[in-house]
Amino acid sequence: MNTLQYYISCFTSMNCNKYRGQVAPHKAMMLIAVMDEIYNGYLTNGFVPHNDGMVKAFESAWRRYVGKSSVFNPVFATPFFHLSSEPFWKLMKSDSYVEKKEYSLGALRESFYGAKLPDDLCQYMAEPASRQRLKRALLDKFVPNWNDNENKWMVAESEIEYKSSDKKNSFRMVA
């Protein structure tokens, strides 16, 4: 079993694109979305789907922490695919897998069933104190001004609540 510190180190040393002097926050927002989905009970076995619920969770994390960016756009398929270069994110190839350098959401869904995370990482993401440390490490590294956003969002779990009628598509953010 890897330690929490190992995953914090993996998260903070991720290989991310840089543009105009800024590090792309896409991978960090994807991981925060995964943590939110684990916290809310929508991901339970380490399998990360690329369904509409996951897309909405990613977009919600982006709005919450990145806000409007003049440099980056919240494109879901990019971090979902490129996280496969990290030691903890394994893409699960489908029978219709086609190798590409970049994937649109449709092509991603056609070529991969989803992604798989190690069990120990999922345990850390599910445990409140560990999840808090993982989130904080991601935000401090990849969204250094996250605490200056106009909404002053905090990492605390109680601030965000997802309501879902089918655990898949219908989410609303409650502040």
Regions found by a protein language model. Name each.
Residues M1-A175:
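Intrinsically disordered, charged low-complexity linkers and terminal tails
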